[in-house]
A protein has these predicted regions:
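Positively charged n-region of N-terminal signal peptides that target proteins for export
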Residues: 1-6
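Catalytic glycan-binding domains that act on GlcNAc-containing polysaccharides
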Residues: 15-160
């Protein structure tokens, strides 16, 4: 079997999602050098894997789609032709946008849990505790996915 195809099928089996959606995580991970399992864990924590999820925040902003992209990112995403509707209706666009946002935090903070926490809570010092809680939530799910990867669950097709 061709290695990229094998990887895609394994990813789809682990995620228990269509190969198309698994491919979205794989493509975004490759493009931004982020483990696709980490992106999947973020989507699980953010939206419960609901591509139509929407959350209105107390500060007036909105979190949109599978990766719960905050509306404060919409002006920057508009430069790429991405609008709120795209994030709500196109799960792959949401995954790619989420990976881009996380990659920007990685550039600023390094590839670590501070960047993951900043994905949800930003970088303001008064949000340290919120960043840490969020990173712990993502880590808990990510660790389970890593364990399944190590245990060979990629081949079994079991749900993460």
């Amino acid at each position: 079997m061709h290695p990229p195809l094998a990887a895609l099928l394994a990813l789809a089996a682990l995620f228990n999602v269509s190969s198309g959606l698994a491919n979205c995580f794989q493509d975004a991970g490759e493009r931004y050098r982020i483990d696709p399992l980490l992106l999947y864990a973020i989507a699980q924590v953010e939206s419960g894997l609901n591509p139509r999820a929407r959350h209105d925040n107390r500060d007036g902003s909105r979190d949109i789609g599978l990766m719960q992209i905050n509306s404060r990112h919409l002006p920057a995403l508009a430069a790429f032709g991405i609008a709120e509707r795209n994030l709500q209706e196109e799960p792959c666009t949401s995954v790619m946008a989420g990976a881009w946002i996380l990659a920007r935090f990685v550039q600023r903070l390094g590839y670590g849990w501070q960047a993951v926490g900043a994905y949800n809570a930003g970088t303001a010092s008064e949000r340290d505790a919120r960043r840490e809680r969020y990173a712990q939530q993502v880590w808990a799910y990510y660790a389970k996915l890593l364990e399944r990867r190590r245990a060979g669950a990629l081949r079994s097709g079991t749900r993460p």
